[in-house]
Amino acid sequence: VLLLAAFYGGARRGTSLQLVSVLGYLFSFLVAVANYQALAKKIELYVPYMSVTADSKLVFYNLDLALDLDKAYYAAVAFIMILFAGWLVTKLICIFANGLRFKRLRFLKGYDWVVAGILNTLLVYLNIYFFFMILSMIPLATIQNLFDKSSTAHFIVESSPIISDYFYRLWITNVIG
């Protein structure tokens, strides 16, 4: 339902305005990649994280990795914070560029709305992935049981094309080692 609403929202915006949003998101993404580790070290005192114990059972991570998972959690939260700040700036820019909503790209002919809908759906899917990925790092039995029982959430975290491997490397491998 969320992805259908995302497609509809993007289709209404049109490709011109949606491209402004995508480019802003891409720029924010690059800034986040460059700066998330420095911010992660600073937010440890302000963002809570439950300690992993020997009894903790995580769906996606073994115990050896889970004992250092707090570092990856802070890295992911820092990344999302930077991305969110960039998203707010992008939304502000989109308010001023709202006239692009009615400008259709000629080379797309009648498919302008489809391209815009797909672009917005991809952005929303990426945000859903971020949400589930951060949840997967929290060693709370209730949350881990949801991942264990939900094949959709499990698929999004573990099998999303391209992004699952990329963010595992970015947040887990690069941070924990």
Locations of regions flagged by a protein language model:
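Alpha-helical transmembrane segments and their juxtamembrane interface "caps"
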Residues: V1-G177
